[in-house]
Structures are given as structure tokens and as C-alpha cells.
Amino acid sequence: MKALHLQHRSPTSYRVKARASYVDETLFGSPARTRPAQPDFDPPWVQNCNRSRGVGPGPPKGSLAKRDCESPSSRGSTPNLTPRKKNKYRLIGHAPSYCDESLFGTSKEGSRMAVGDAAKLRTLFWTPPATPRGSHTPCPRETPLRAIHPAGPSRTEPRVTAGSQMSSQDGLCVPCSLGQRRSHSLTHLTVPSTGHPASSAPQTNGPWSPRPNTSGATVQSPLVTSKACSGRVSGPAPPRRGACPPKPKPPWK
């Protein structure tokens, strides 16, 4: 009960009576007694030392301005002609911004955008590049591929066509596309590793060998089929690049 009594009494016992401020008098009216007049302060951008507006009869205005310009802390130690130290936080100049013009209107000199700042503001915005990225123009890394690809088939096409005609006469399979011809040529290189001797590799590869085969008889492997042997023994045949490689039989058959 005692604690509750103290809580009930605490707001009234510790209340501080505040005097009516200037804001209270402006909003809610002045109290019974009259309040002294507020001093008339100059705006911060006015830099004059003459503050003798409401001064009555006395010394001349020049002496008052001279006395006001002196700092109170330096009157005793320094001479009287020392000027007052400048306040570094005083607002020297202010150019109206976009927010100022939006809230308070344009100034008398003219709008901020009419002075010539519109051209400067355009450089702040992002501008798209001259060539759009979604166009059908080829990428720079695709151009060397276009220069390399046509040169490959033009050199090897006459030999491939001649070899395909001869292979069709012998009854061997003929590939249809250049990609298959290249894959078959790679299989020719891998055939000697399965069981052929190293000496027969340049003879069976056709155009891959440095010297063409002049003699009709060749060294035959036991794994080569009879159909492929009959084609070799018949005579010196032109190199066939597109012919299918013979499938070797395993030794246990």
C-alpha cells in the first residue's frame, strides 16, 4: 500500500513548473504579465557590424559599431582596434537548389534550370551504346571461325570425291558427310594400334603417308579381311580417304 501511495504521489511532488516560453505564448497566448520584446536578429548572410537600431541617446553610432566589432574576451589583453574573429560556420553564399525552388518558388535571378545547367545534367544519365547488344551482327570472336572453316573443305574436297568414287566401285561403304570422313580418317590412325605392324601404318593410311605405295604387293596382317586384301593386291590404287576401315577378327576365331 505504501508503494502504491508513493507512486500516486510522485507525479505531483516532482513536477517542475516551467515558465511559458516564446513558443507557448505564440501558440496558446501570452500570460497575465507582459513578456519583454525579443531582440531583432539579422539573418546569417548579413555581414554588418552596426547593431545600434534601438539605442537611445548616448555616444555616436560609429563608436557603437566599433565597440560591437570587438570581441568581449580580447578587450583587456589586446588593443581595441582588433576586429572580431570570423565565424567559420557562417553561411557565406547559398545557391537555390531544386528542393528550394520546389518549396519556395524560383528566385528573382531566374530558375536554376534556366541558367544552363540542363546540359550539364544530361551527362549524369546513362546513355545506351551505339550498337545494341540484341542485334544479329556477329560477335568479334566468331569472325576468325568464318575465315578458317571454308579453307578446310576446299583443299580436301577433290581428293575426297575421287576416293569416294573408287570406294563405291570396290563395294566398300561411302560416308555421306565431311564430318564422317574425318571420323573415319581418325579410325585409320587407330587401326595399327590394334594389331597391325608399324611398317604397314603409312601404307594403309593412304593420303596420310609421306610416299605413295608404288608396288602392288604389300605386307598383309593375319587380321586383315580377304575383301580388303583383294583390293590391295589388284594393283596400285589411288588413295582412298573415305573408305570404311576393315574390322579385324579376334585371334580366337
Swiss-Prot record:
Disulfide feature: none
Give one GO term, molecular function aspect. Answer: tubulin binding
**Keywords (A to Z) from UniProt:** Cytoplasm, Cytoskeleton, Neurogenesis, Notch signaling pathway, Nucleus
Biased composition regions of type Polar residues, renumbered to the chain: 71-81, 188-228
Q: Where is this region: Interaction with RBPJ/RBPSUH?
A: 112-140
Which Pfam families does the record cross-reference, listed alphabetically?
RITA (PF17066)
Cellular component terms per the entry's GO annotation: centrosome; cytoplasm; nucleoplasm; nucleus
Q: Which InterPro entries match?
A: RITA1
Region labeled Disordered — which residues?
30-89, 127-175, 188-253
Tell me where in or outside the cell this protein is found: Cytoplasm; Nucleus; Cytoplasm, Cytoskeleton, Microtubule organizing center, Centrosome
**Gene Ontology biological process terms, A to Z:** negative regulation of Notch signaling pathway; neurogenesis; Notch signaling pathway; nuclear export
| Main subcellular location | cytoplasm
Q: Where is this region: Interaction with tubulin?
A: 140-253
Highest taxon of source: Eukaryota
Give the residue interval(s) assigned to the motif Nuclear localization signal: 81-97
Q: Which family does it belong to?
A: Belongs to the RITA family.
Quaternary structure (record) = Interacts with RBPJ/RBPSUH.
Function noted in UniProt: Tubulin-binding protein that acts as a negative regulator of Notch signaling pathway. Shuttles between the cytoplasm and the nucleus and mediates the nuclear export of RBPJ/RBPSUH, thereby preventing the interaction between RBPJ/RBPSUH and NICD product of Notch proteins (Notch intracellular domain), leading to down-regulate Notch-mediated transcription. May play a role in neurogenesis.
Q: What is this protein called?
A: RBPJ-interacting and tubulin-associated protein 1
Taxonomic source organism: Mus musculus
The UniProt gene name for this protein comes to: Rita1
